[in-house]
UniProtKB/Swiss-Prot annotation:
Gene that this sequence comes from: queC
UniProt xrefs under PANTHER family: 7-CYANO-7-DEAZAGUANINE SYNTHASE
Protein name, per record: 7-cyano-7-deazaguanine synthase
Transferase in keyword set: no
Binding annotation for ATP: 32-42
Organism annotation: Leptospira borgpetersenii serovar Hardjo-bovis (strain JB197)
Length: 242
């Protein structure tokens, strides 16, 4: 009799664990800036059937206007959205955060890492995302990094993402218990043209995204790398931004 009860108890525990694991697999943290890439990434996570916690950062960036677009998108979708405020003093040496440094214009395609690179930004952003993912029982983090039509940032490369994912597995409770947090990079190997086409298929409201490093009076400058790449993507596809 006891043996039968033990078997039933083990069966129930196993079912409970499977149900919990399934629920965790349905949850994801999405890093959302409000730009074209991160918003397309958000819609890909939705298409993957994920229950999403969006995470954005206010770190004193010149293009903070993107956050207002992130708010619009998450409100429209009814998605939980956290904006984490960080001190600008943490991000020195970048033209995206320092008024004394000018954002490069019409310089797309140059080999060197541009001064729009923000030291340690993706490392820090992913660390916050890991905290949120583990705390909410999420098994994946979506980030819209891109290594094709990109500005040369080292923290957007596949090697960085792979290495960071290994660090997460080694340094978290979930990773040590055999339920590692995965970093999902759906745009990693896509050109800007392909990202626009993907966004179009996913029905991303492009008019609710903003891509500019140096906006003036809430309008895109049209000359920075972010503006030029966005323009290139839409021109090559013929897809409308509106």
């Amino acid at each position: 009799m006891n043996s039968r009860k033990d078997k039933n108890s083990k069966g129930k525990n196993s079912d409970t664990k499977r149900k919990k694991s399934s629920q965790e697999n349905d949850k994801a943290v999405v890093l959302l800036s409000g730009g074209l890439d991160s918003t397309t990434c958000l819609y890909q996570a939705l298409a993957d059937g994920k229950k999403i916690q969006a995470l954005s950062f206010d770190y004193g960036q010149k293009h903070k206007i993107e956050l207002s677009y992130a708010k619009k998108i998450t409100r429209q979708l009814g998605i939980s959205h956290t904006i984490q405020k960080l001190k600008p003093e943490l991000f020195l040496g970048s033209s995206l955060t320092q008024k004394s440094l000018r954002v490069p214009k019409n310089s797309l395609g140059k080999e060197e890492i541009p001064n729009t690179y923000v030291p340690g930004r993706n490392i820090l952003f992913l660390s916050f995302a890991v905290c949120l993912a583990e705390g909410t029982g999420s098994n994946s983090i979506y980030i819209g990094v891109n290594a094709m039509d990109y500005s040369g940032y080292p923290d957007c490369r596949p090697e960085f993402i792979k290495t960071y994912e290994t660090a997460i597995q080694l340094g978290t409770k979930k990773g040590n218990q055999g339920s590692p947090i995965k970093i999902v990079t759906p745009l990693q190997n896509l050109s800007k043209k392909e990202i626009v086409l993907l966004g179009n298929r996913l029905q991303v409201p492009f008019h609710l995204t903003f891509s500019c490093y140096d906006p003036k009076n809430r309008k895109a400058c049209g000359k920075c790398d972010a503006c030029l790449l966005r323009k290139k993507g839409f021109q090559e596809t013929g897809v409308s931004e509106k």
